[in-house]
Amino acid sequence: MERIILRKGKSIREAMEEQGVLEKFLKNRPKIDPAAKYHFNNDAVAYEPFTNYLDSFYFGEISIGTP
């Protein structure tokens, strides 16, 4: 197991905010009912969709082989 140092990059949200297009983008997104994924009175599994991708941006450097 090898540990990789992660660095946080500028998120898509930050980049869109700088360009002044974030508010328009978010207004055009469909509204989703967060409770719709739960089936009440049912023993089904509730799935949590990964949709908050605007705030996530991490990268790490990986090198393979010898220089």
From Swiss-Prot:
Q: Where is this protein localized, as stated in its record?
A: Secreted
Please write the reaction equations for the catalytic activity of this protein: Degradation of gelatin, little activity on hemoglobin. Specificity on B chain of insulin more restricted than that of pepsin A. Does not cleave 1-Phe-|-Val-2, 4-Gln-|-His-5 or 23-Gly-|-Phe-24
Answer yes or no on keyword Secreted.
Answer: yes
Give me the disulphide-bonded residues.
none
Q: Which positions are tagged coiled coil?
A: none
User: What does the record give as EC number?
Assistant: 3.4.23.2
UniProt-listed InterPro entries: Aspartic_peptidase_N, Peptidase_aspartic_dom_sf
Secreted: present as a keyword of the record?
Answer: yes
Keyword annotations = Aspartyl protease, Digestion, Hydrolase, Protease, Secreted, Zymogen
GO MF terms, alphabetically ordered: aspartic-type endopeptidase activity
Superkingdom to which the source organism belongs: Eukaryota
- Its primary localisation, in coarse terms, equals secreted
- GO-annotated biological processes: digestion; proteolysis
Q: What class of enzyme is it?
A: hydrolase
Positions annotated as pro-peptide in this chain are 1-43
Q: Name one GO cellular component term.
A: extracellular region
Give the family, as the similarity comment puts it.
Belongs to the peptidase A1 family.
Name listed for the protein in its UniProt record: Pepsin B
Tell me the organism: Sus scrofa
Q: What is the lineage of its organism?
A: Eukaryota, Metazoa, Chordata, Craniata, Vertebrata
